[in-house]
Structures are given as structure tokens and as C-alpha cells.
Amino acid sequence: MPVPPPPAPPPPPTFALANTEKPSLNKTEQAGRNALLSDISKGKKLKKTVTNDRSAPILDKPKGAGGGYGGGSGGGGGGGSSGGGGNFGGGGPPGLGGLFQAGMPKLRSTANRDNDSGGSRPPILPPGGRATSAKPFSSPSGPGRFPAPSPGHRSGPPEPPRNRMPPPRPDVGSKPDSLPPPVPNTPRPIPSSLHNRGSPAGLGAPRPPFPGNRGAAFGAGSVRQNLSSSSSPFPRPPLPPTPSRALDDKPPPPPPPVGNRPSMHREAVPPPPSQNSKPPVPSTPRPGAGSQAPPPPPPSRPGPPPLPPTSSDEIPRLPQRNLSLTSPTPPLPSPGRSGPLPPPPTERPPPPVRDPPGRSGPLPPPPPINRNGSTARALPATPQLPSRSGMDSPRSGPRPPLPPDRPGAGAPPPPPPSTSVRNGFQDSSCEDEWESRFYFHPISDLPPPEPYVPTTKTYPSKVARSESRSGSNRRERGAPPLPPIPR
């Protein structure tokens, strides 16, 4: 509209008159102007209908039904009028105009509501988050719905949202009551302090329930954990070690590991022993294993020396995923474990199924090395494992012969798949899957790296920079033309 200023000010009929006069002056542009006018007039008609229909009810109903509800529904979430406009839908520009006109009363109502019931207001935003913001805006389109909620808000605005609150968070029914203590989590204070930004606050609020359901340990998940267990910040640190501890305590670890990190975080929060296991974490689960079953862990440490000498045995095992890069070179396992300590606990619980039988078999030292944590975890589960030892003992038997036959390396992978099937349910990490699927060459097969020779290296880019610093600009200018010449 602002693009053609002369025709814009008059209404559509004036448009037609002015255009009829102008085309007579310019005959060549008659068709183009007529088409533009027809399109503009059509657009204007549609816009008029939308603006009249939408603006009148929006302005009238909030005033008649009480600005308070308007603020609760739209003002809080629509403090940014742009967000409100999107929710109104229909005609964007008319919705925006309606928002601007009704925005002032909404903001005032929000201020009043904050003064009247500051604490009660926040629940309105979180319960629906996006849903609530969308519902109130969509409700005005349906006039029947709008008046009904308004009386409810008059009678008790905070109550209806609270009724909505519990369904999204059935696990934490007392959350609204317990909200004040967990304020540090800051899901609540944000809505209270940012009613105008109700939409973002709501977004933050609804997410906690859903991620909590997933058991994610991210801020939202921790909120529930903190509510469920008074130790709000503490559950997170012990969590990484907890998988090892909890698995030790629970002989049937397979089910929990399925969602090890998510589920374990929830389950691990209650058991404080996890904290006890945390200090040993730096040294991997060995110390924890020592506390629970000192005899096996010691073999695990002395075990490393025997394994390295039997490089042939280690080579076939690498593909089997038992050693997982630990046997070929003891230094490698240590860095790998030191970095991903938390993940290995999740990965290791399943392997104990294999390794403990190995203990029963003729190779007790190697299994402890294969997974230091597995020794500790396998101990509680050992009674169950002997039954599987029959299955695993043959594996331990073929392993020694396999080393001489590297071609047989193809054979070791088949047994791992069965174990990987077991672990597939438990392990969420990709390392185990890759180790079971693919065959990794031992270090002995790889060619030795070139010897390191200290030499001075020259970099032309640095040379040019040094010259430019010295002030020889002519050389720089000469250098660029040279490359184009060969081209």
C-alpha cells in the first residue's frame, strides 16, 4: 500500500476513479494498472472482512469479560505482541492491530494479577506452555469458549491451571507445593519474573515434564529428581559412577542398562552409595570392585602383564570386543577409560555376562582386564552367570586357539554377535557395536610409524609475512602475479 502513495490514501472506489483517469493519460499502462488495482481491491476486501471480524470480538470480549483473563491468556504469553499475533492466526496484520489495541489492557491486567496473585500466576504459564498460550488465543476465535473461562478466572484464576498442571506431571503431584524450595532450579521464578514472556517461560516449563519422562539428566530431568529426592544438586555428580554401583547392588542389571543413563539417573538418585563409589571413579571401577570383592580386582591388575605377553591371544580377542582395545596395549585402555569413564560403566554391565564365565573358565585374569568394572559387577551376578558359563566357556576355549589362526578371526565375530545381542539391549554406546561388527587390526599388523627426525620447516606464507613486516612491499606485489602466470 505505501508503495503507490497517491492511490493509497483514498478508499478502493477512489482507486478505481483515479486509475480510470490515469490510464487515459497513459494507454500503454492501462492493462497493468487494472490488474494491479483488481488484485489490490481483492486483497483489501479480504483484509477488511478479517479486520472487522477479528478486531471487534478481541477488543470487546476482554473489556466485557474482564481484562484480567485477557491478560492471563494472551497478555502473559503475548507480552511480545508478535507471538500473540501468530497465535491469533487468521489475518496477520489485523491480528497484530487487535493485539496492539488490546495489548495495553492485557499488560495492565497482568500487572494487577501479579500484585493480586503473583504466585498463582506462574502455574498458568507452565501447565500448557505452548498449549496454554495457543488455547487462549484460539479460544477467542470460538466466542463460546472465551466467556466460559473468563468467569472461571474471576472465581479462581490460579485453580484451573493447577488442575491442568498435575496431568502433565503425574509423577510429581506435590510439585506445585514443593516449588518454593527448588526455586534454584529456576523453572518457576522465570515465569513469575517474566509474565510478559509467558510463552518462553511456558516453553521451559512444559519441557521439564517430558524430558523428565525420558529420564534425561539435563536440567529438566534433574528438576524432578531434585523434587523426588531432597538432594537437589548432588544427584548429578554421583550419577556417572552410580551405574556401576547400582548394577552391583542389583544382580539383574540387564533391564536398567537399557536406558542406562536416563533410567539409572532416576534410580541412582535414591541410593547414596553411589557417592561412595564416586571417589573411586577416577581409578575406574577397580576400587569399587575391591570394596565389594577384593579377590577378583587384584587379579585384574596382575592380569595385565600376562595378557600383554600373549599378544597372539589378544589379537583375536580384539575383534570380539572383550578387550575393546584394552589388551593390545595397556596404555591405550587407560586413556580410553579415563576419558569415557561414565560411558564404560554403562557399556560394561552387559559384558560381565561373558567375562564372569571366563573367570569360571581357564582364563580368569584376562576377563578382569577386559572390564575392570565388569569384575565388580559380575560378582553379584556370578551365581546367575555360571548357568551361562556353559555357553561362554566354549568361547573361552576357542579363544586361545583362535590367536594362532588369524584367519579364524572371522570366527570370533560370530560369538560376539550373540553377546552383542545381549548387550544390544543394555548398551547404548556405539563402541561395543562397532567392536562386535568389525574386525580391528592389532597394532602388530600396522606398519611402524616413520622415525621422527627434528628438522627446520619452512612455510612460504610465514616468509611472505616476515617480508611484509620488513617493508619489502614490492616483493609481495611481485609474488601474486606469479601464480596466475602458470594458470
UniProtKB/Swiss-Prot annotation:
UniProt modified residues of type Phosphothreonine? T329
Q: How does it assemble?
A: Binds to WAS within the N-terminal region, at a site distinct from the CDC42-binding site. Binds profilin and actin. Interacts with DBNL. Binds to WASL. Interacts with DBNL. Interacts with FNBP1L (via the SH3 domain).
Q: What does this protein do?
A: Plays a role in the reorganization of the actin cytoskeleton. Contributes with NCK1 and GRB2 in the recruitment and activation of WASL. Plays a role in the formation of cell ruffles. May participate in regulating the subcellular localization of WASL, resulting in the disassembly of stress fibers in favor of filopodia formation.
Localization per Swiss-Prot or TrEMBL: Cytoplasmic vesicle; Cytoplasm, Cytoskeleton; Cell projection, Ruffle
Q: Where are the XRSGPXPPXP motif repeats?
A: 336-345, 358-367, 394-403
Biased composition annotated in UniProt, kind: Polar residues: 21-31, 419-428
Comp. bias (Low complexity): 136-147
Region of interest (Disordered), ranges = 1-487
Phosphoserine is found on S138, S222, S324, S334
Location of the WH2 domain: 32-49
What family is this?
Answer: Belongs to the verprolin family.
Protein name, entry field: WAS/WASL-interacting protein family member 1
Q: Which GO terms describe its molecular function?
A: actin binding; cytoskeletal anchor activity; protein folding chaperone; SH3 domain binding
Q: Name one GO biological process term.
A: response to other organism
Give the sites modified to Omega-N-methylarginine.
R121, R130
Specify the species: Rattus norvegicus
Listed GO cellular component terms? Answer: actin cytoskeleton; actin filament; cytoplasmic vesicle; ruffle
- Renumbered to this chain, the Basic and acidic residues biased-composition regions fall at 464-478
